[in-house]
Amino acid sequence: MDATRQAASAPGRTRRRRGTARSAGVALGAFAAVRGGGALVVALGAWWAGKDPVKVLGGSWDSFWYLSIAARGYGRTQMWPASDSIQSDYAFFPLYPLLVDLTGGGPVAGLVVSWTAAAAAAVGVYRIGELLLGARAGVLLVALWASLPHAVVLGLAYTEPLLCALAAWSLYALLRGRWLWAASLAALAGLTRPTGIAVAAAVTVVALRELLVRGNRAPAVWAAGLLAPAGWASYVMAVGAHRHDPLGYFTVQRQWGSRFDFGGGTLETVWKALSGGPVTLPVTVTLAVLAAAGLLAVAAVLDRTPLPLLVYTATLLVITFGGAGFFESKPRFLLPAFPLLLPVAAAMARARPRTAVAVTAGLAGLSWGYGAYLLLIATVPP
């Protein structure tokens, strides 16, 4: 009898898998259309301005540092006497430069790694949306995420695409109870960016809940809680050992002008902007994104978003709002916080298809224009 039921259910499982694969393909196609269009706009703008599109996409701002690490390893320091600042490449985590080096090095290799990671991230974001809200909302979640103001970064030789991919699949594994997969990907996320600690926080907090609240003391749960933060901690300790200072990594960050001041710097910039001081377009966009992120965070809590996604997103918000320096880059720091878009995707999934398409197309167009502005006109890093 059991064998008969299993045989009967096999075709159903096959159909479900095919349906999931088709929907994931639609999500990936939507992502490719939105971000491919954005890259085309940047490339055309670069040609018009007499710039090399590959260098604009693969060698701008932080990309220079990642490519330098990939080519020559760590040890580069740049001093700016005018501002009395020292910039060390130890501020940048090692996984992305390592992958660029393994791919051959240079801007093209950087873009190959980033675009591959961005595609993996899009499918991971879709799977989370599908799991929680259904296939249509999952596709819309990906399209919304690809249409964010700073989503141009997903097509640059930056670490955000890699972090988003590792975070999305780690969180998906965690939601499915695959502890070791979730922890392993979280450890890799911790080797990608400082904010990779958010993925580790999600895995560790959920593991603690299993251990302390639900009484689940399975070895995989213990291992996940210990493994998840290992990547982030190992790099921070390695920099500390190199500089003969346990807090050496945070010293490097302060020398870059980045530190955690519990939101003092953010509030100061917001106050100056709102009190009538000169406000640039990047500052205006940042203010709008931070306000929207705060509102969406409240919506996520009210919608009873699963604990792993809440912890992950809350950690990103604390780091972004609480950090001083690089105010105009805060929307980029929130780019991995895709769970904030779940309530919006759910609402759009209930709307008419024509409305959802129109909203997404409008947001994508704005993202294309702003992305080109950031890379070709703005004087601050994206």
List where the protein language model places each region.
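Short hydrophobic/aromatic helix or loop-helix immediately within or flanking a transmembrane segment
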Residues: 61-75, 83-105, 263-270
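Transmembrane-helix motifs of polytopic, lipid-linked glycan transferases
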Residues: 101-102, 112-132, 295-298
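Signature aromatic-anchored transmembrane alpha helix within multi-pass, membrane-resident enzymes
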Residues: 225-229, 350-380
